[in-house]
Amino acid sequence: MSDAILYVSDDSFETDVLKSSKPVLVDFWAEWCGPCKMIAPILEEIADEYADRLRVAKFNIDENPNTPPQYAIRGIPTLLLFKAGKLEATKVGALSKAQLTAFLDSQL
């Protein structure tokens, strides 16, 4: 696991995501989710490569049931990009690294 990835919970979401000084890409995931496991190594690479511009956070929906409904999380993996405490963009489903970097480059 990359040290650059932040693990957030219902309790830490406001502090770690909404009050972050950097944009935060939050991966809503679960242990049983195959596509979530597929994108995990890509997110680790992104966390390292974009460390100067972006925080990458992982949010386990099974362990933290309160936050996902606030953002209408219906399927996983769901990636939400927050800037200055506001939800700026959403991507649902497993993305390739090229798709994810194109998405991030268009938003940052």
Swiss-Prot record:
GO terms for cellular component: cytosol. It holds the Pfam family Thioredoxin. Keywords: Disulfide bond, Electron transport, Redox-active center, Transport. SUPFAM superfamilies: Thioredoxin-like (SSF52833). GO terms for biological process: cell redox homeostasis. Residues 2-108 form the Thioredoxin domain. Disulfide bonds join 33-36. The keyword Transport applies. GO terms for molecular function: protein-disulfide reductase activity. InterPro entries: Thioredoxin, Thioredoxin-like_sf, Thioredoxin_CS, Thioredoxin_domain. Belongs to the thioredoxin family. Component of the thioredoxin-thioredoxin reductase system. Participates in various redox reactions through the reversible oxidation of its active center dithiol to a disulfide and catalyzes dithiol-disulfide exchange reactions. NCBIfam families: PRK09381.1 (NF006898), thioredoxin (TIGR01068). This is Thioredoxin. It comes from Acidithiobacillus ferridurans. The lineage of its organism: Bacteria, Pseudomonadati, Pseudomonadota, Acidithiobacillia, Acidithiobacillales.
